[in-house]
Amino acid sequence: MKSGRYIGVMSGTSLDGVDVVLAAIDENMVAQQASLTWPIPVALKEAILSICQGQQLTLSQLGQLDVKLGALFGEAVLALMHQENLHPQDIVAIGCHGQTVWHEPTGDAPHSLQIGDNNQIVAKTGVTVVGDFRRRDIALGGQGAPLVPAFHEALLAHPVERRMVLNIGGIANLSMLIPGQPVRGYDTGPGNMLMDAWIWRQRRMAYDKDAQWAREGKVIIPLLQTFLSDPYFAAPAPKSTGREYFNYGWLERQLAQFPGLAAQDVQATLVELTAVSISEQVLLSGGCERLLVCGGGSRNPLVMARLAGLLPGTEVTTTDEAGISGDDMEALAFAWLAWRTVAGLQGNLPSVTGAREASVLGAIYPANPRHNQS
């Protein structure tokens, strides 16, 4: 198997930065060695957000965004390589998820579109890149998401303890690691996405640090009930969603029924939406003894406190306490998925995505052999 050092790259639905992780990976271990977060320029972030909310653009504009984002990913990887004094031949491959701008896994022509030209990353770094992870699963009848539960199973499953892993990025997703049962998982709904969108529009802040603003407000129960009446929350698994659905336009449509609300009350209610929609799915799935939380939302003390309050009898903690950085989990997962692709191993879990069969995922963008001798 192609063991060695891999790099994972993930920007996520929150667009709060490009996470880059270096790890040593083989069939027995995933050992994180270094990481960094690379900033996304505001203009690029806003252009991506506009696409995700359905704003029309020309093919030329889409092509330019694809190249610019790929170049940014390449710069982020180079920064990590320079930080760790690494050369191209030291890295087997880079696993790059890309930036999802549209995810529509149902209908006549199911699809998922990520941008961030992987050729740009290869050209800048001299390292082979593995990308386009989702579309094979969709071609096999799956949702193409979530893909991270397979990684959660490999690292965090316990032989006796009922565990669930909760990733709170822009979207929140659950992985159910129940002994003796196939792994299941799906997107529960918005994680940080709506909270971040609201504070960005209201206060031009990227996120609500330590939930300081939300703590100034109060939960508006009728508004929360309106949020939760969206059909996505009651839809059966397998299911997945993204910014093309839960975006600022969605929030505006709900708020139109409640004119004059204080902005901080809306923020407090969005925190409660995230916590309630997650906890309901945990309970509907039979509950767990330990809920291991990762992603940006694990750093939100109000979200964590509400989850603990809504899930009595469950130990709500972070993956950091299990030895895996919650901030780097998704980037690490795509480094691991790149390893599986290079090794010719299946990367999806049909019990999670609904695909007809397990499959090797992704496309390989090989580096020039003179650069990449791994």
From Swiss-Prot:
> According to its UniProt record, in which pathway does this protein act?
Amino-sugar metabolism; 1,6-anhydro-N-acetylmuramate degradation; Cell wall biogenesis; peptidoglycan recycling
Q: Does the keyword Nucleotide-binding apply?
A: yes
Q: Which Gene3D superfamilies match?
A: 3.30.420.40
Its lineage opens with:
Bacteria, Pseudomonadati, Pseudomonadota, Gammaproteobacteria, Enterobacterales
The record's listing under CDD domains reads: ASKHA_NBD_ANMK
List the keywords (alphabetical): ATP-binding, Carbohydrate metabolism, Kinase, Nucleotide-binding, Transferase
Q: Which domain of life is it from?
A: Bacteria
List residues binding ATP.
Answer: 12-19
Catalyzed reactions per annotation: 1,6-anhydro-N-acetyl-beta-muramate + ATP + H2O = N-acetyl-D-muramate 6-phosphate + ADP + H(+)
Pfam families xrefs:
AnmK
Please give the InterPro entries that the UniProt record associates with this protein. Answer: Anhydro_N_Ac-Mur_kinase, ATPase_NBD
Similarity field: Belongs to the anhydro-N-acetylmuramic acid kinase family.
The answer to whether UniProt assigns keyword ATP-binding to this entry is yes
EC class of this enzyme?
transferase
Provide the GO MF annotations for this entry.
ATP binding; kinase activity; phosphotransferase activity, alcohol group as acceptor
UniProt-recorded name of the protein:
Anhydro-N-acetylmuramic acid kinase
Gene Ontology biological-process entries: 1,6-anhydro-N-acetyl-beta-muramic acid catabolic process; amino sugar metabolic process; peptidoglycan turnover
The UniProt record lists the EC number as 2.7.1.170
Which N-terminal residues, if any, form the signal peptide? none
> What does this protein's UniProt record list under function?
Catalyzes the specific phosphorylation of 1,6-anhydro-N-acetylmuramic acid (anhMurNAc) with the simultaneous cleavage of the 1,6-anhydro ring, generating MurNAc-6-P. Is required for the utilization of anhMurNAc either imported from the medium or derived from its own cell wall murein, and thus plays a role in cell wall recycling.
